[in-house]
Amino acid sequence: MPVLGSQRRLLGSLNCTPPATFPLTLAPNRTGPQCLEVSIPDGLFLSLGLVSLVENVLVVAAIAKNRNLHSPMYYFICCLAMSDLLVSVSNVLETAVMLLLEAGALAAQAAVVQQLDNVIDVLICGSMVSSLCFLGAIAVDRYISIFYALRYHSVVTLPRAWRIIAAIWVASILTSLLFITYYNHTVVLLCLVGFFIAMLALMAVLYVHMLARACQHARGIARLQKRQRPIHQGFGLKGAATLTILLGVFFLCWGPFFLHLSLIVLCPQHPTCGCIFKNFNLFLALIICNAIVDPLIYAFRSQELRKTLQEVLQCSW
């Protein structure tokens, strides 16, 4: 991806240097203090990508197999899995090609490698944008199902869901093409950062409001059963923990990457920002980790989907 600092690009493999011996090193900074640089081995990238690949393929297969899961909510989850799948595929493909180039097992001209690198960058950027969009779509879907339960099936219909899904994919493709073409323009980077902040704010507002409604509902039940304190406190703590995990994982996995983009605009030449740029590979690895965690948060918590997943695994054996 076209960003400043240390990055995983195929063209760099044509003039490769031996990898660092230790995963954690202090990179010297000529104009400032030493930088803490975390080196991510290619083998770790491959491992994370393959784990995410298997997980998200299973989610897509389970939803496709079970007709009971053919609803807007599960279609959004399926599309999120497909987005995470593209994140995994693009990174596995890039890492594999880099390793082949470094080993001399693959001979390619610089122009061919440049085209392949551009294609992979489009895949990575498009899958990131679509993943963020579908996370937001899932939050909106859950919000409507709670606050407009009686009207949910008339508001969130299959045709509308399909139109939203199509719009997200088209917008993701166009955004990735624009980003790859105009990546050196400040406005493009600011738009991506603003999009991330908007998605984070949307999810935070919706999920906090849903938690407040759930706690209010729990208090009502507690009053009827005259056991207000235990039920309310237990439910509130459980809901707060779930909310913290959901938003915390989202922020921790995506935040560093978009901080990287922000600093490219704000302080591209500052020594401290340069230290952060050196850890771009770590930020990319965190996004792949998010692709691993997403199925655990959004898909595998469904009993129906877990049951279907067991059937899929049994059939594969």
Swiss-Prot record:
SUPFAM superfamilies, per the entry: Family A G protein-coupled receptor-like
Single Gene Ontology MF annotation: melanocyte-stimulating hormone receptor activity
Chief site of localization: membrane
Similarity field: Belongs to the G-protein coupled receptor 1 family.
Residues with glycosylation annotation: 29
Cellular compartment(s): Cell membrane
UniProt keyword Transmembrane helix present: yes
Bilayer topology annotation: Multi-pass membrane protein
Lineage: Eukaryota, Metazoa, Chordata, Craniata, Vertebrata
Cytoplasmic side: 64-72, 141-163, 212-240, 301-317
TM ranges: 38-63, 73-93, 119-140, 164-183, 192-211, 241-266, 280-300
UniProt subunit comment: Interacts with MGRN1, but does not undergo MGRN1-mediated ubiquitination; this interaction competes with GNAS-binding and thus inhibits agonist-induced cAMP production. Interacts with OPN3; the interaction results in a decrease in MC1R-mediated cAMP signaling and ultimately a decrease in melanin production in melanocytes.
Protein name, as recorded: Melanocyte-stimulating hormone receptor
Recorded name of the encoding gene: MC1R
Residues bearing a lipid moiety (S-palmitoyl cysteine): 315
